[in-house]
Amino acid sequence: MTDLVIRALDESDAHLFDTLQDPLDARAAHRLTRHRADWKRVALRDGEVVARAAWWGGPDDTEPVNVNWFDVAEGEEDAGAELLRTAPWQVELELNLPADWREDARLRAAAEARFSAARAAGHELLVERYLYRWTPDRGLPQRPGRLDFRAEPDDAVFFEALRRIHSVTLDAHSLKAIQEGGLDRAAQEELDFFRWCPSPREWWQTAYTTAGDLAGIHIPVHNPAGPCVGFIGVVPEQRGHGYAYDLLAECTHFLVERGAEFVTAATDHGNFPMAANFTKARYPVVRERINFAPARRE
């Protein structure tokens, strides 16, 4: 086997990225994603692309947030691993897969080849997630009318609410943040994400019961690809009443009232209550995302 050549791309040779087959239909999944040419890298053997990766960030980011497009040719898992291992950015890897990838043998083999390459590069599986996309033909979810929704200008209110919400959580990213830096880190990471989104700060809302107690928060946002459910969370002492659905319904209405023609969302496979709420609110699963944490550097 000939030697592998790792190559960073720019505008002059960005076309090389598109020469590898796309069995997992990543191009369609990223039709609204804007990738920078100089954040793309390929691995070549005998002049042909055998692995590729595209790192991604928002328009104002100076470094990538994640690598969200990663492919390897059949039998080239080692090339894919080398492509990730030698990259200047060691960030989370997101593999965006068709919803039926487990049932289709061809898709499963392609997905597992990418998993193998990621693990060989030192990445560790973090979580598997459902990706949702609501569209108007699904019908708007009914608003139960049980909660009072309010704009809240004080970030400290959201920070404390997030600490309470994450004190009992099923979310893998939050659990990782708590393990690394406690509840404060988990809450701050959420706030940083909300602030990173280009939508107005005024959209963030708290929700109160008829007794005046905080039930939770919902954060409707636009990310760089469009409108999405940024966060849904119920404080522990108010769980068991189905309020997460109320928050999701309100978040959907809020975005639609401001012109959204679709709303995207995601939740972990293990978050069964939230997955049930998305189903109830008529959000179909359109794809799945497998998140790998980056290799740890000593």
Predicted regions and their residues:
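Conserved acetyl-CoA-binding loop-helix of GNAT-fold acetyltransferases
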Residues: E76-Q90, V234, G240-E257, A275-K280
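Short amphipathic alpha-helix that is part of the acyltransferase structural core
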Residues: M1-A29, R143-D184
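Acyl-donor-binding surface of acyltransferase catalytic domains
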Residues: E76-P153, F292-P294
